[in-house]
Amino acid sequence: MNRRFFLLGTAAQAAVRRPVMGSGEHTYEAFHDWGRLPDGLSWGNTHGVAEDSEGRIYIAHTVHASSERKDSLVVFDQDGKYIRSWGAAFQGGAHGLHLRREGREDFLYFVDTGKGRPGGGVQVTYSCLVKMTLRGETVFRLGYPFESPDYKKDGSTKFSPTNVAIAPNGDIYLADGYGAYNILQYDSKGRFIRSFGGSQFACPHGLMVDTRSAEPSLLVADRTNNRLQRVSLDGRQLGSHNGVNLPCHFHERRGLVVMPDLAARLTLLDASNQVIAHLGEDTTGDWQELRKKPRTEFRAGKFVSPHGACFDHDGNIFVTEWVEVGRVTKLRRV
C-alpha cells in the first residue's frame, strides 16, 4: 500500500474515534453534541429527554438568549436528524419530560418550572405540568395547586415543578422540586388526590414509579440532601440510599436505572438501587464554572452537568446537560 495513503487512512480513523465510557457489559461509545438543530434555533440549558414508541427522541431546553427561534421542545430521529419543534411559550422554564403509551397513542407529560420569564425568579402563572400529544396539542394543564392544603389559597406559596412520573394506574406524581418541595398526586384526568413531602425533602428534583418489585413505590431524587428516598405511592417513607451526588432524575430499562448526577457524572443502579457504575465522571471539580463556558472547553468523554437521561429501545442512553449552550450526548452501547 502507498505509505501516504496508509497514513491518511490511519489519520481518518483516528479522527472519528469516539471516547468510551464504562466497562464490561456497561460500556458505551460517546457521541457528544448529538442532534442537528435547524438554522435559527440554538440550545439553551438542555433539561429533559424522552423516547416515543417509534424511536423518536424529544428534548426539552430553555432556548439560548441568542436564538432566533424560540421552540423549547425539539424532536429528532435516531440518527439525530431534526423532525419538528414547538413550545415557544415554555422558553426559559422547559424542564422535565415523561413519555407514556396510553392505548394506541403516545402522550408527552411536560413540566415548566416557571423560570426564565420577565421579572426574574419563578413566575407561578407559568409553572405547570402539561399533558400533550406528540404534535403539541394540549390535553390538560395542571397549574398552581390551589386544592392542596400545603399551598396558600392566595397563590403565594412558591410553586416551581421540575419532573413528573406516572403510576401503572395512570396516577400522576409531580415533583415541586424548586418550590415547596412537595410531591403532588393527581389521577389520570388531572384531579388532585394528595400532596406530601415538604420538609422531608430538599429539592425533590426527579422521581420514578419503581415497578421492579411486587409492590410499586416512588423513587425520589432528593437532590440537595444527596440521597435517594423511596416512598409508598401514598407518601409513606420506606427507606433511603446515600452516596449519590446531586441526583436529578431516573429512567429504567429491564431492571437497570440510569440516574444523572448533576455534579459531572452519570450513575447506573441495579434493582436494589445500588451503584453499578459511574459513567463519564469528571473529578476535576470545576463543573459549576465549566457549565457557563463555550462547548469548545468541554472535555470529550467527560460530563459537565448531567440533568436528564433516558434509555432508548436498544439500550443506548441519551443524556442532556445543564450547560448554558446545551449539550446532548448519545451513549451507544458496545
Task: Identify what each model region corresponds to.
Residues M1-A11:
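N-terminal secretory signal peptides and thylakoid transit peptides that target proteins
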Residues S42-S53, F90-G103, G116, E147-D171, ...:
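Beta-rich, blade/repeat-based domains predominating
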Residues R69-E102:
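Blade-loop segments of beta-propeller domains
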Residues A15-F31:
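Blade/loop signatures of beta-propeller domains
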Residues S305-V334:
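Blade-level signature of beta-propeller repeat domains, shared across WD40, Kelch, NHL, RCC1
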Residues R56-Y58, F107-Y109, I172-Y173, S217-L219, ...:
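Conserved beta-propeller blade signature
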Residues G35-D39, W86-F90, V139-S156, I193-Q200, ...:
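Surface-exposed loop and turn segments in beta-propeller and other repeat-based domains
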Residues H32-S66:
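Beta-strand-rich domains and repeat architectures in extracellular enzymes and scaffolds
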